[in-house]
Amino acid sequence: MDNQFIFKYSWETLPKKWVKKIEKSEHGNRFDTNTDYLFQLLCFLKLHTYTRFQVLIDICGVDYPSRKRRFEVVYNLLSTRYNSRIRLQTCADEVTRISLVVSLFPSAGWWEREVWDMFGVSFINHPDLRRILTDYGFEGHPLRKDFPLSGYVEVRYDDPEKRVVSEPIEMTQEFRYFDFASPWEQRNGNEG
């Protein structure tokens, strides 16, 4: 059974309200869904005889600050039975909570913690939603586009005090001027 058959069959079989948009490409197929139907769609893709996407490869997040629902959460699935991959995407904002899928894919707990830690997207009734990649005292979510590149605090080891200290970051340069003009566009017309 080829990838296109699985995709076409899934699309024809699924309730249309579950899927907002589909995309077929050489890099893999994609379903966009609403957060309300995420769990049902994942159940279908995992358990149906002609899909069998039983491996959750990854859950990752993307931040689009200009969108109303700025966070996109992407579920990458693999069907080892049919050698096929599919991406499932849903959107959320700071207050929208996404369905927990640990009951379907036990490894999802780790991925959901990572998405929460890096982006601040929360999951409904997650049993252990705490930081996984950043320090427990870390403030903010570092993969958000509005997170400052230098962070909020500096963590360093203080040798005289023999302990780790956190201090607010002090920028030595308060004002910077960025010249975005290309030096190639400023060339004299006489050169040549």
Curated annotation (Swiss-Prot):
**Role according to the record:** Core subunit of the mitochondrial membrane respiratory chain NADH dehydrogenase (Complex I) that is believed to belong to the minimal assembly required for catalysis. Complex I functions in the transfer of electrons from NADH to the respiratory chain. The immediate electron acceptor for the enzyme is believed to be ubiquinone.
Q: Which reaction does it catalyse?
A: a ubiquinone + NADH + 5 H(+)(in) = a ubiquinol + NAD(+) + 4 H(+)(out)
| PANTHER family xrefs | NADH DEHYDROGENASE [UBIQUINONE] IRON-SULFUR PROTEIN 3, MITOCHONDRIAL, NADH DEHYDROGENASE UBIQUINONE IRON-SULFUR PROTEIN 3
* Protein's cellular compartments: Mitochondrion inner membrane
Q: What is the first-listed, main subcellular location in coarse terms?
A: mitochondrion
The protein's superkingdom reads Eukaryota
Kindly list the GO molecular function terms attached to this UniProt entry.
NADH dehydrogenase (ubiquinone) activity
Q: List the HAMAP family.
A: NDH1_NuoC
Task: List the keywords (alphabetical).
Answer: Electron transport, Membrane, Mitochondrion, Mitochondrion inner membrane, NAD, Oxidoreductase, Respiratory chain, Translocase, Transport, Ubiquinone
- Catalytic class of the enzyme: translocase
This enzyme's EC code(s): 7.1.1.2
Return the similarity comment: Belongs to the complex I 30 kDa subunit family.
Please provide one cellular component term from the Gene Ontology annotations of this protein: mitochondrial inner membrane
Assembly and oligomerization: Complex I is composed of about 45 different subunits. This is a component of the iron-sulfur (IP) fragment of the enzyme.
Carries keyword Nuclease? Answer: no
This protein's membrane topology, according to the annotation, is:
Peripheral membrane protein
* InterPro entries reported in the protein's UniProt record: NADH_DH_suC, NADH_quin_OxRdtase_su_C/D-like, NADH_UbQ_OxRdtase_30kDa_su, NADH_UbQ_OxRdtase_CS
Its protein name is: NADH dehydrogenase [ubiquinone] iron-sulfur protein 3
